[in-house]
Regions:
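Sec/Tat signal peptide C-region and signal peptidase I cleavage site
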Residues: 15-17
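Residue-level preference for short coil/turn positions at secondary-structure junctions
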Residues: 35-36, 98-99, 126, 198, ...
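An acidic, glycine-rich "communication" segment
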Residues: 36, 133-239, 304-334
Length: 334
């Protein structure tokens, strides 16, 4: 009997894994009565800040409260289908970008095969709107295949016209440094007063943003940026921590245009905030939802009171290398 139970358990476990592996990404479809007909693709892939937790949560908000169809992609183990943020060379489902009206990316030092990366390149050439979160300033790092036609996107590229790679040329900045003390200081978001007086749609209803991740350093942003939010370091990692007056402020959220050679002009929204625990801040979630509307030409619909309530349970894992929850498959984040 014990042998039969063991065999049955093994078969059941194998069937469950096969079922999970059959779903390499997750899609949320809105009710027909609330669907706006638009598709947002969210791409996770970072080793530290738990994008694999944050993006499904944002996708559920966009679908449930705002009528977007959403698809979430993950860095996975190609053999098992298990989520593995440390695998920098594989994100299944990039072809979903072909039907995307907007993409939200949360990437760090990825080097995807050309067969996957070509969909992202086509997306940019089409001039489609893009949101980049936290480490997406240094989304790509080409080391194994420097001859790839997409190696120009590498964060440390020095080629004329592509200095700073994707981060600087498309989002406005690449990786510079930690302006705040990583792991001991948080970020207090300060809304830009001029943009607020101009009633910029992205910051409508946004006033109270704090997150435990530290402020990233930046230089003068590339292109034609409009800074919407500045970051002030806090002397501690709790929402009531006082600001560190010895630290200057840095831009932490902005918009800008972009255009790759041979492509159409597009718009981006970038923020250097965005870990899974940062998104416990209601107004940070609102910032992303507002940016989604604005980039899709729906800024007039934003009044700052739209729901950004989390759908279902959300217990984000604290950021840290190697600390992602093991044994998870995309379907576990439905």
């Amino acid at each position: 009997l014990l042998l039969l139970i063991t065999i049955y358990s093994s078969i059941a476990a194998g069937c469950l894994q096969a079922q999970q592996n059959d779903e390499p990404w997750i899609t949320f479809t809105p009710e027909q009565s609330v669907s706006n007909g638009l598709h947002v693709v969210l791409i996770s892939g970072d080793e530290e800040y738990r994008s694999e937790e944050a993006l499904p949560m944002l996708a559920k908000i966009l679908t449930t409260h705002h009528g977007f169809k959403t698809t979430v992609l993950f860095s996975t183990d190609p053999e098992t289908g298990e989520i593995n943020p440390d695998n920098q060379n594989h994100i299944v489902g990039m072809e979903n970008l072909q039907s995307a009206d907007l993409a939200i990316i949360f990437l760090r030092f990825r080097e995807l095969p050309d067969s996957e990366m070509r969909y992202f390149d086509e997306f940019l050439k089409a001039g489609k709107p893009l949101i980049g979160l936290r480490t997406s300033t240094h989304a790509f790092a080409y080391q194994k295949n420097p001859e790839s036609p997409y190696a120009k996107y590498s964060w440390n590229n020095n080629e004329p016209g592509w200095q700073g790679g994707f981060g600087r040329q498309i989002l406005g900045e690449t990786w510079v440094d930690h302006h705040g003390d990583h792991g001991t200081e948080g970020t207090r978001g300060l809304v830009d007063g001029i943009m607020e007086r101009m009633n910029h749609p992205v910051i409508r209803g946004v006033s109270d943003i704090w997150g435990p991740t530290d402020v990233y350093g930046t230089r003068v942003l590339e292109g034609d940026p409009e800074v919407l939010l500045w970051g002030q370091s806090t002397a501690g990692m709790t929402p009531d921590a006082p600001v560190n007056w010895e630290k200057s402020i840095m831009p932490v959220a902005w918009t800008k245009s972009y255009q790759v050679e041979g492509g159409s002009e597009g718009q981006v929204f970038a923020t250097t905030m965005g870990s899974s625990v940062d998104f416990e801040s209601e107004d940070l979630r609102r910032l992303i939802v507002n940016a989604t509307y604005w980039l899709l030409g729906k800024g007039s619909e934003i009044d700052g009171t739209e729901s950004v309530e989390i759908v279902g349970d959300y217990e984000p894992t604290m950021f840290g290398f190697g600390d992602y929850v093991k044994g998870k498959y995309p379907s576990d984040y439905k």
